[in-house]
Every structure is written in C-alpha cells, then in structure tokens.
Amino acid sequence: ALFELYELDQTDLTLFATGGYGRGELHPFSDVDLLLLSPNPIDEALNQKISPFVAKLWDIGIDPALVVRSVEECDEACHDDITVATSLLEARILAGNVVQAGLPMQLLNKNWSQTKFYEAKMAEAKERYLKHNSTEYNLEPDLKNAPGGLRDIHTCLLYTSPSPRDRTS
C-alpha cells in the first residue's frame, strides 16, 4: 500500500524482497532487505519519489536495507559480486511492474552458470571461516556467520536443490 501511496506504482519501478525477507525468513530485529529495480537510469525526479517512501518505512518501524538500481547497474553489480548474485536468487516481487518479476533470475542466469555460482559460494564460505575461526567457542558466538551458522544452512539449502530457485526454506 505504501508503494501506491507514494505513487511509485506510477513509475516503472519494481520492489523486490531480498535476503532473509526474500527467503521468507524475516527474524525479529532484522533489517528488511529490499531492491527497487528500474529499467531506466535512476534520475533525480525518481529519487525525489523514493525518498519519502523510504522515510515512511523508517517512521513505521521498518529498518530497510534498501538498494535502488537500474537494470544496467544491477547487471554490473551481479556480474562482479556473489553477494548481489545471491540476493537476486532470493528476490521475490512485492509491488510494481510485474513484467519485471523475472528480471532478477534473468540477470543471475546471464552472469553466473550454476557451476560458477556454487564455486563462488564455496569460496565465500571458506573466506568467512577464516574470518570467524574458532568463534564457536566465544562467549557470544556469531550464529549467523560462524562455521555451522545460518549462512552455512542457507548454502546447504542451495546445494541440495535441483535448481537454486527451487529450494525451500
């Protein structure tokens, strides 16, 4: 309803849930990962429409982790960053131009073969393990990033699905 209230439905923007919200795993006190995707470059007039929408999200108690990108910018970011690619894999349309609903997967498939994606996820996990070495013995272990944490569970779910998009949470 906020998307329409701020007349973002009158634009070519599409609002996607990504991350935990895209997976349907929003936890208490989590930020809400969102992607606003435009087929055209983001100009100042569009930014002027987006700003009050984001402010209202904050006002009603939502902690948005919002990314605003054109399709071209998203394509470039996806090509270079496994984190962006993963967010596109988990993207779920919330509002806007339904014609763009499949764009996140199209961008992912354009830039990443399944093998390349899985290899990058494994490299990401190895890097995370080095960073969080032996943190499972800390007084307050990092349940999200430490070995055996939520990030590993999500990676396992990706590996055990016939297609990454087919996996269930």
Where are the model-predicted features located?
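Single conserved hydrophobic/aromatic residue that forms the stacking wall/gate
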Residues: Y159-S169
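Active-site nucleotide-donor binding segment shared across nucleotidyl transfer reactions
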Residues: A1-N47
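Core structural elements
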Residues: G19-G22, E119-H132, K144-S161
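Charged/polar positions within long, soluble alpha-helices
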Residues: F3, W58, I62, R69, ...
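Conserved catalytic core of two-metal-ion nucleotidyltransferases
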Residues: Q48-A95
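C-terminal or mid-to-C-terminal helical accessory/interaction module adjacent to the motor/catalytic core
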Residues: T86-N138
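Conserved structured core elements
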Residues: F29, E44-N47, S51, E119, ...
